[in-house]
């Protein structure tokens, strides 16, 4: 199946360096089986810190899952070296923030939640534990004395 990029697009107000924080950051995804096309009904998360051995000693993956419909074992791996921040200059443009190595599982939807961080453009103030589940986030930068926000968060998957 190959590699699939997750691209993010958002409107940033007075913040930059929007990024997922830590190896325990949860990427909430809905997956599709590459064999039969079954799509998971529930959100599932994968984390960088999780590593599951593949059958037959073929390495490991962030998630290994048996399809409920066709019983095929599929896996997906977060490629840690591809995790990127979304910056002020990326404002309102799609940018790849992570790549997944997909072996039978294809992500079809993404739900950003808690665990993001960003910084004030002028002040460098760090805003941690940003939750993007509502696709919007607002706060106030005391140092810069201005409102900050992240709005209209959307995403797309691109096969590479």
Curated annotation (Swiss-Prot):
Signal peptide: none annotated. The keyword Hydrolase does not apply. The keyword Zinc applies. Keywords: Metal-binding, Phosphoprotein, Zinc. It holds the Pfam family CXXC_Zn-b_euk. GO terms for molecular function: zinc ion binding. Zn(2+) binds at residues 33, 36, 67, 70. The modification Phosphoserine is found at residue 75. InterPro entries: CXXC_Zn-binding_euk. Monomer. Belongs to the UPF0587 family. The N-terminal and the C-terminal half of the protein have a very similar 3D-structure, suggesting they arose from duplication. Requires a bound zinc ion for normal folding and solubility. This is CXXC motif containing zinc binding protein. It comes from Bos taurus (Bovine).
């Amino acid at each position: 199946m190959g590699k699939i990029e997750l691209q993010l697009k958002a409107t940033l107000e007075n913040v930059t360096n929007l990024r997922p924080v830590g190896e325990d950051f949860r990427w909430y995804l809905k997956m599709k089986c590459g064999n039969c096309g079954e799509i998971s009904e529930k959100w599932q998360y994968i984390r960088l810190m999780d590593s599951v051995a593949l059958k037959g000693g073929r390495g490991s993956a962030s998630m290994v899952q048996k399809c409920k419909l066709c019983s095929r074992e599929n896996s997906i791996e977060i490629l840690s070296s591809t995790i990127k921040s979304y910056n002020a200059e990326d404002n309102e443009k799609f940018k790849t923030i992570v790549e997944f190595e997909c072996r039978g599982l294809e992500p079809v939807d993404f739900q950003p939640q808690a665990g993001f961080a960003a910084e004030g453009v002028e002040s460098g103030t760090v805003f941690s534990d940003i939750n993007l589940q509502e696709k919007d986030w607002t706060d106030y930068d005391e140092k810069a004395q201005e409102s900050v926000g992240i709005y209209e968060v959307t995403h797309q998957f691109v096969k590479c």
